[in-house]
Amino acid sequence: MLTFLIPTAKEMVIPKESYPHLLPQPSQAILKAMAAMTTEDLAKAYRIKEEAAKKEQQRWQDMTSQQSLAYPAYQLFNGLMYRHIKRDKLTTQEQAYLTQQVYITSSFYGIIPANHPIAEHRHDFHTRIKIEGQSLKSYWRPCYNQFAKEHPQVISLLSSEFDDVFSKDCKQLWIGPKFMAEKEGQFKTHSTISKKARGAFLTACMENNCQTVDSLKSLVFAGFYYHPDLSTDHEFVYIKKEA
């Protein structure tokens, strides 16, 4: 069985379905540290203006006082990649695929199933904060490595932010799809192409119920197709021709 890892997103939209917010134990220390920060501290940690930091401070305070509601993560996150993932009107098989084989890597919650209920928050591995004297990446590394050991065959749709959270020896069987546009024999890639394609790729995997590495090679989605000559055992390259 294939396991997919996808990143979080800064952009969020509130879904209709909500739950009480239950925070995993490793996240408690992060919440305590974030909630103790002043607006000025948060502005520096996030590299944002103090006005925007006030909103984030309120979110952390609401979590601390257990006032926060939680929403299925794949519905709450609404970045470009998420908007290209099929999230509505799923078949029973597609819903099972999304909730059992797709996991979200978070600097606040750890690695969670795609439908895990989470609260509105702003947090990533670039957030300037120490937890128990460690960087966020060092703090989460044991949990992330344990997940990797339990799920050796991972299809990673993660950004470079996550490259060194996992130890190298845990990623020996990982495959990272790469998405490129071809025009007049020239290949190019950029974040917009990649984000849209990640969502379309995951949707195609769900719709085709891909369970083997070889099944990924026959996928055609949003104009992309597998390119064997550019691909390696650990990087599957998908090309889209541009006019």
UniProtKB/Swiss-Prot annotation:
GO cellular component entries: cytosol
InterPro entries: YaaA
Any one Gene Ontology BP term: response to hydroperoxide
TM stretches of this protein: none
Family: Belongs to the UPF0246 family.
Name this protein carries in UniProt: UPF0246 protein MGAS10750_Spy1880
Record lineage: Bacteria, Bacillati, Bacillota, Bacilli, Lactobacillales
